[in-house]
Structures are given as C-alpha cells and as structure tokens.
C-alpha cells in the first residue's frame, strides 16, 4: 500500500505542514509539536518511503511533492527541513495557490557544491550513496552526527535524532539512495526567484551541511525572501533552540 502517514493536531485557523529531512521521520518534531499545535492546525507527515509511509520506492522530487500534496489541506504554511525544504519549495513552485507561506529550515536550493556555490562536495554525497549499500544504519548515523556537530548541546541533539530514526523501521536503501540523489542533483536557485508567497529561510550558523555563506548569496538572489540565522545552532535549530524557533513561526503567522 502506498499510503502517506499523516497526523493532524491542534485547532488553529492557520494550517502548518512540517516536512522532515533525509533518513528521518515526523517524530523529529516532537520537541516542538505541542507548542506549535497551540497556535496552528499542525500537520506531521512522514515523507514517502520514510517512517510509516511505506510501500514507496525512490521518487523524484516532483513525484515526492505530488504524493505529499494529495493529503494536504487546501492552503497551509509549508515548512521543510533540509531535504524537506526542497519538497516544500517544489510544492510552492508547482502549486503556489496551496502555499500561504514557504519556510525552509537548514535547507539549500542546491545542496551540492558547484562553481562559486558553497555546498556539500559531490564526492561526499556519492560516498554516502556507496556506503549505504555496505552498512546503511552506520551511514545514517554518521549523517546525523554531522548535523549537530559544533553546538553546545551536540551530543544530546545527536541522541535525539538517533532516537527518532530508531523509533521506527529504517527506510529501504533505495529510498535513502533516492533522497541522496535529490540532494546531489536538484538546483532550485533560479526557479525560486519568482515565488509569490512570503518566504522565510532559517539557518544554523554552525551548520556543516548548508554553509552560512549561502545566506547572503540567496538574500541577493531572492530579495523578496527573509533570512534568519540561529547563532549557536547547527543543522537542526528546532532541536537546539525550540523556543526561539517557535517564536519565529508564530510571528510569521501574524503576517500571512
């Protein structure tokens, strides 16, 4: 069965859909879901092939976005973390009428380093793909450790991420590989210049996967968007700075 796992909480007049990152599932939001569901009608989603959304193989970004949209409210703020940021961005590009505001968290329109564009070196992503077939649990754990490195709470944040992964069955290797392929190949820098809705980009100053150098570059490329950097966060600011993170989303709600 190809079913997207979807949970709705709260009674707010604005809908907020949260999309998680690579290798993870919607349990990653448990540190903030109570707070957010007191302000929004909150939608927690396991991306196709991840967590409880079983029965999917590797999907393209476009197919992943369409699969998620089928169960979504008519209009919502879409928030995507890391890989989820690409999915939310794709939805904003193809179905702008469904997106009240777009929020990307520790995400890049182009994760892979290119000429004069900072990002993850393509051989690092290719290495992760190679290691997946050898020892995919260890590969996922390495990727998670990278996400919290450098923060004051790095160890406990990494434990929180690992617990999220281990709480549910691991995704299939081809699903994980497909997610890495999206991170390796997708480039939405130019298309996102023209999104019509409010667009908020959140970053961690210490993020080892999305270099902070991209922030001023995107400020220039997307002058209609707003950016905010969590000074002491890495790749998962909602885990290390949950109160500050929720404040920003509640403030955004007042503006849309």
Swiss-Prot record:
Catalytic class of the enzyme: hydrolase
MF-aspect GO terms: pimelyl-[acyl-carrier protein] methyl ester esterase activity
Listed InterPro entries: AB_hydrolase_1, AB_hydrolase_fold, BioH, Carboxylesterase_BioH
Subcellular location(s) of the protein: Cytoplasm
Keyword Phosphoprotein: no
Active site feature: 82 (nucleophile), 207, 235
Record keywords, A-Z: Biotin biosynthesis, Cytoplasm, Hydrolase, Serine esterase
Enzyme Commission no: 3.1.1.85
UniProt binding sites for substrate: 22, 82-83, 143-147, 235
Domain of life, per lineage: Bacteria
AB hydrolase-1 domain sequence ranges: 15-242
Main location per the UniProt record: cytoplasm
Reactions it catalyzes: 6-carboxyhexanoyl-[ACP] methyl ester + H2O = 6-carboxyhexanoyl-[ACP] + methanol + H(+)
A single cellular component GO annotation: cytoplasm
Functional pathway: Cofactor biosynthesis; biotin biosynthesis
UniProt GO BP: biotin biosynthetic process
Summary of the function given for this chain in its UniProt record: The physiological role of BioH is to remove the methyl group introduced by BioC when the pimeloyl moiety is complete. It allows to synthesize pimeloyl-ACP via the fatty acid synthetic pathway through the hydrolysis of the ester bonds of pimeloyl-ACP esters.
Family to which this protein belongs: Belongs to the AB hydrolase superfamily. Carboxylesterase BioH family.
Subunit composition and interactions: Monomer.
Protein known as: Pimeloyl-[acyl-carrier protein] methyl ester esterase
Species this chain originates from: Escherichia coli O139:H28 (strain E24377A / ETEC)
Gene: bioH
